[in-house]
């Protein structure tokens, strides 16, 4: 609450970047512009964005805020462009890897359902 972050930071940023058609150099440039608490290596960040593109959701394990983990999924329009992001944050260590995967999958399902509902009229025309 009351905190401002770069749009590309954290799980929300990875989720949005994953839905955009960016090459590795563009993702690395975004990475360089973020003020990290614990910066991932640029290649690791690129790999995280690419993994988010496959899974449909992204995670940040305390790299923006120590002790806070976030899972996020982008809500996309009919053209696949990210318009909104659905996210959940928790204290790091609260969930194991399997729990985070389950939360991520649920976030992806919810984001897809919201997108389908929000853009249903666009899809019908």
Question: What are these model-derived regions, one by one?
Answer:
Residues 1, 66-69, 124-125:
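Long hydrophobic alpha-helices with heptad-repeat/coiled-coil character
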Residues 1-64:
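Short, solvent-exposed recognition segments
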Residues 23-24, 78-79, 122:
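Short, flexible segments with low predicted structural confidence
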Residues 27-35, 108-125:
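Cysteine/selenocysteine-centered motifs that mediate thiol-based redox chemistry or coordinate metal-sulfur cofactors
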